[in-house]
């Protein structure tokens, strides 16, 4: 029996500085390298990385829900034990701090192990995944792809799709009132790394750009879209400025859409994703030049 239902591990949203200002997040600031391209002399926090914390207890609950759905359990699935290993470090409780993985594009191994009571029987569960993330001091965009695993004698876990988990960060509270900013950075998919070039005109509150260097999609044109205030109703509910389902065109895959957020105290960064319907194609992030 193959378990396609478990082929996509969903990570809950991180509690970042956008929510810590209201008392919901960590009070600790994490040191991170300076972006090196910050032209705003008044930005005294460019060398600080916002907290990027993930609760192990939330991952444990997600695993219970995934198993319950996969096996149509009439009663809630409960884990008697749970551990997750990320980049070689094992966690059984507390928080996982993604900032320790460093800025830039990372592809990190994730292994979850658990003991689960499913329909009255105890099974040892192992799920292997690859975490793809692009991290900047003020933002992060992540994708998770299950690579395999086993649920006791019930069957194997198949390889899953390249799925977006989230893009979040310290949301820009007040947009610049005028001027155009160009953002350059990285775009990525399951195996490739490309480039992002995006420009926002804050006079007109519109943005447009392109992604290049990804053979799977070819060049992606991110068509001009309105910059608006967006309500995010995910795990950490908050608002941010950006683009919601903007129109885009892929050379190889036709019409696609993109979502983009603006992050940092001075609109320092952008991060986002490109998708086609329910299929996630790429993530991206860039900093102000």
Regions found by a protein language model. Give the residues of each.
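Bacterial Sec-dependent N-terminal signal peptides
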Residues: 1-7
């Amino acid at each position: 029996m193959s378990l396609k239902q478990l082929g996509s591990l969903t990570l809950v949203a991180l509690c970042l500085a956008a929510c810590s200002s209201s008392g919901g997040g960590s009070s600790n600031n994490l040191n991170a390298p300076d972006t090196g391209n910050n032209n705003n002399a008044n930005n005294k926090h460019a060398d600080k990385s916002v907290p990027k914390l993930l609760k192990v207890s939330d991952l444990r609950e997600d695993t219970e829900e995934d198993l319950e759905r996969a096996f149509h359990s009439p009663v809630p699935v409960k884990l008697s034990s749970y551990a997750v290993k990320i980049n070689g470090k094992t966690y059984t409780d507390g928080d996982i701090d993604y900032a320790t993985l460093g800025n830039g594009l990372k592809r990190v191994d994730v292994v979850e192990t658990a003991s689960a009571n499913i329909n009255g029987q105890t099974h040892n569960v192992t799920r292997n995944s690859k975490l793809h993330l692009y991290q900047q001091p003020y933002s992060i965009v992540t994708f998770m792809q299950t690579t395999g695993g086993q649920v006791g004698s019930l069957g194997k876990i198949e390889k899953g799709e390249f799925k977006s988990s989230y893009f979040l960060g310290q949301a820009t509270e007040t947009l610049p009132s005028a001027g155009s900013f160009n953002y350059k950075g990285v775009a990525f998919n399951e195996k490739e790394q490309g480039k992002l070039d995006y420009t926002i005109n804050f006079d007109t509150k519109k943005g447009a750009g392109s992604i290049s260097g990804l053979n799977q999609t070819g060049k992606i044109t991110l068509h001009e879209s309105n910059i608006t205030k967006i309500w995010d109703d995910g795990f950490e509910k908050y608002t941010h400025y950006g683009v919601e389902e903007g129109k885009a065109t892929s050379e190889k895959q036709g019409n696609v859409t993109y979502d983009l957020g603006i992050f940092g105290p001075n609109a320092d960064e952008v991060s986002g994703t490109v998708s086609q319907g329910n299929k996630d194609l790429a993530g991206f992030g860039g900093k102000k030049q």
